[in-house]
Amino acid sequence: IQTIRFGDRITVQLQPLPEPYRELAVPRFILQPLFENAYNHGVEKMENGLIQLRFKMQPEFLNIYVENNGSCPDAELEKLTQYLNSTDRKAECTALKNVKLRMQMQGGDLQVSHGTLGGFGVSLRLPLHPAHSLNTEQQNGQPQKEETNHADTVACG
């Protein structure tokens, strides 16, 4: 849909996920809001917009980066960082806050920063062994089955 809307004005570069990580259970819809924000708040008005998805593997985590080459004023970045780190349950729940909360439920995190492309960047830190799947001890004499129905939304307040 975004390709039809923006045509050739915006390029999206997607790094393929390395094979060993393709079976990793992740919370649903964690990338869609990041791409929507990159389009709508980062590169929407640009003639040569660029959105990039890339991965960095670590022994215990998979880091996922969504970045754009739009503007990223320091004041806006600081305000967003404070909002994302706020524990105020009365605060408005945006897509980024929702993704951050869902990542934290899995033992991961979401951080915002200046991206390597010069614009806004979001990094997701996803544990290779989520907290809920680490406890495979038996309960009532039965082995625990790994959770596969990941939440789509989280109540923020």
Across the structure, where does each feature detected by a protein language model lie?
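Two-component histidine phosphotransfer core
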Residues: 1-111, 120
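Short, intrinsically disordered, low-complexity segments enriched in Ser/Thr and Pro
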Residues: 32, 128-132
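Short, charged, solvent-exposed linker or helix-capping segments at domain edges/interfaces
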Residues: 75-77, 133-138
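Short C-terminal beta-strand
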Residues: 120-129
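Long, low-complexity, intrinsically disordered segments
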Residues: 140-157
